[in-house]
């Protein structure tokens, strides 16, 4: 079973690598991708938070925002409702798909025990996984990814070629 996690500095393109890889794999007829993707929420050039999207259903919510009432992490408030309703459910439901995508295993997501439990269910399965791993997280779940996954570091020199390389690895392994 192929399990790849990409890591690297903030803003280097980890989520973009995973998104481009998932898009390429989704072109394969009958190939189902499930899981989550996060993206920046920007206003007037400033990052105000992050959205979270269920890759299978397209359902979108707010993961975190500068304005909010959830647990605070840096300048953001984590929206536990959307993280659990959309994020944790998307990860659990992805067990019925051909590939589980998790963007990201990072401090915001790891605040939710429901999300952590959903990811642990995936790790206990035999499903192929493609994940974004926060570069410095010391959470026990992040450590499991570092030990059990092939970890690729994204940088400006390889970020354009990685989606194709990762796609080809999954296609060879999954037939």
Swiss-Prot record:
GO molecular function: ATP binding; ribonucleoside triphosphate phosphatase activity
UniProt-annotated binding residues for ATP: 8-15, 99-106
Catalytic activity: a ribonucleoside 5'-triphosphate + H2O = a ribonucleoside 5'-diphosphate + phosphate + H(+)
Key words of the record: ATP-binding, Hydrolase, Nucleotide-binding
Pfam families assigned: NTPase_1 (PF03266)
EC number: 3.6.1.15
Superkingdom: Archaea
InterPro entries registered for this protein in UniProt: Nuc-triphosphatase_THEP1, P-loop_NTPase
SUPFAM superfamilies the record matches: P-loop containing nucleoside triphosphate hydrolases (SSF52540)
Known function: Has nucleotide phosphatase activity towards ATP, GTP, CTP, TTP and UTP. May hydrolyze nucleoside diphosphates with lower efficiency.
Stated family: Belongs to the THEP1 NTPase family.
Name of the protein this chain belongs to: Nucleoside-triphosphatase THEP1
Organism: Methanosarcina acetivorans (strain ATCC 35395 / DSM 2834 / JCM 12185 / C2A)
